[in-house]
C-alpha cells in the first residue's frame, strides 16, 4: 500500500487558507460596515454627523484594530509573507492614536479630524482586505491588484498628517486634565503630553521608513505581476 494522502480539508495549507480567508472576511465586513455607516450618516445629517462619529462606530473600530494585531503573529509564524517591523510600525501608529489619544480623551472624540482619519483608515483597509481575501482563494483582478498597491501612496501620508493633527488638537486637553499622566513622589513623574510631543516627531520618521519600504515592495510586486500577466 502506498502512503496515505490526507483529505484536502485536513492539509495544513488548506486550513491556513481557510483561517486567513475568514480573518480577512471579518476585517472586510467590519471596515465595510464602518464606512457604510459613516456615509449614510453624512448624507442623513450632513456635517453634524462628523461630531459624533466616534460614538457611532468607535466600538467596531476598536474591535477591528484590536483584531488586526493578530497580523503580527501571522507574520511571525510565517502564514503571511509581509515584513514584521514595517507592519509593526503601522499597527503601533493606529493603536496609539485610537486607544491612547482618541478613546482616552472624550473631548477629542468630537473633533472632525477623527471622522477624516477613520475614513482614510477604512479606505485603505477595505481595499487591502478585499485583495488579500481574494488572493487566498486564488482569485486575481488586475485593477484591484494595482489599486491595492497604489492607493496607499496618496492616502498613507494623509493618514499620518491626520494622526499628527489629532495629537496636536489633543495636547491642550491632556495638559489640562492630566489624562494618562502619572504623578510620582520623585522626579520621574510621567507627563503624557510630553510623551505625545515626542511621539509626534517619531511619527514622521516612521512614515518615511514605512513609505520607503512600501514603495520598494510595490515596485517589486508589480514587476513580478506584470511578468505573470504576460505569460498568461
UniProtKB/Swiss-Prot annotation:
Pathway in which the depicted protein is active: Lipid metabolism; fatty acid biosynthesis
Entry-linked Pfam families: PTPLA
Species this protein is from: Mus musculus (Mouse)
GO biological process, one term: very long-chain fatty acid biosynthetic process
Keyword Endoplasmic reticulum: yes
Catalytic activity, as annotated: a very-long-chain (3R)-3-hydroxyacyl-CoA = a very-long-chain (2E)-enoyl-CoA + H2O; (3R)-hydroxyhexadecanoyl-CoA = (2E)-hexadecenoyl-CoA + H2O
Alphabetic keyword roster: Endoplasmic reticulum, Fatty acid biosynthesis, Fatty acid metabolism, Lipid biosynthesis, Lipid metabolism, Lyase, Membrane, Transmembrane, Transmembrane helix
EC number(s) recorded for this UniProt protein: 4.2.1.134
Subunit record text: May interact with enzymes of the ELO family (including ELOVL1); with those enzymes that mediate condensation, the first of the four steps of the reaction cycle responsible for fatty acids elongation, may be part of a larger fatty acids elongase complex.
Any GO MF annotation of the entry: very-long-chain (3R)-3-hydroxyacyl-CoA dehydratase activity
An annotated GO cellular component: endoplasmic reticulum membrane
Annotated active site: 156, 163
Family according to the record: Belongs to the very long-chain fatty acids dehydratase HACD family.
Domain of life, per lineage: Eukaryota
Cellular localisation: Endoplasmic reticulum membrane
Disulfide topology: none
Transmembrane segments: 20-40, 57-77, 113-133, 136-156, 158-178, 190-210
The protein's role, per its UniProt record: Catalyzes the third of the four reactions of the long-chain fatty acids elongation cycle. This endoplasmic reticulum-bound enzymatic process, allows the addition of two carbons to the chain of long- and very long-chain fatty acids/VLCFAs per cycle. This enzyme catalyzes the dehydration of the 3-hydroxyacyl-CoA intermediate into trans-2,3-enoyl-CoA, within each cycle of fatty acid elongation. Thereby, it participates in the production of VLCFAs of different chain lengths that are involved in multiple biological processes as precursors of membrane lipids and lipid mediators.
Membrane topology, Cytoplasmic segments: 1-19, 78-112, 157, 211-232
Positions on the Lumenal side per record topology: 41-56, 134-135, 179-189
Membrane topology, from the record: Multi-pass membrane protein
Protein name: Very-long-chain (3R)-3-hydroxyacyl-CoA dehydratase 4
Amino acid at each position: 500500500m502506498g502512503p496515505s494522502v490526507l483529505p484536502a480539508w485536513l492539509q495544513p495549507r488548506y486550513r491556513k487558507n481557510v483561517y486567513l480567508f475568514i480573518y480577512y472576511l471579518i476585517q472586510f465586513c467590519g471596515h465595510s460596515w464602518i464606512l457604510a455607516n459613516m456615509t449614510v450618516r453624512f448624507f442623513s445629517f450632513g456635517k453634524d454627523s462628523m461630531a459624533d462619529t466616534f460614538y457611532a462606530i468607535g466600538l467596531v473600530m476598536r474591535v477591528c484594530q484590536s483584531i488586526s494585531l493578530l497580523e503580527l503573529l501571522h507574520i511571525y509564524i510565517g502564514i503571511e509573507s509581509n515584513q514584521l517591523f514595517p507592519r509593526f510600525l503601522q499597527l503601533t501608529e493606529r493603536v496609539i492614536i485610537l486607544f491612547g489619544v482618541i478613546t482616552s480623551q472624550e473631548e477629542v472624540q468630537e473633533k472632525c479630524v477623527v471622522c477624516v482619519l477613520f475614513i482614510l483608515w477604512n479606505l485603505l483597509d477595505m481595499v487591502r482586505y478585499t485583495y488579500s481575501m481574494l488572493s487566498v482563494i486564488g482569485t486575481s483582478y488586475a485593477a484591484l491588484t494595482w489599486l491595492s498597491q497604489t492607493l496607499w501612496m496618496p492616502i498613507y501620508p494623509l493618514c499620518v498628517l491626520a494622526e499628527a493633527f489629532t495629537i496636536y488638537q489633543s495636547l491642550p486637553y491632556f495638559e489640562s486634565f492630566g489624562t494618562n499622566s502619572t504623578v510620582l513622589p520623585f522626579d520621574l513623574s510621567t507627563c503624557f503630553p510630553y510623551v505625545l510631543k515626542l511621539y509626534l516627531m517619531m511619527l514622521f520618521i516612521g512614515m518615511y521608513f514605512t513609505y520607503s519600504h512600501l514603495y520598494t515592495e510595490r515596485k517589486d510586486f508589480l514587476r513580478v505581476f506584470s511578468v505573470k500577466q504576460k505569460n498568461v
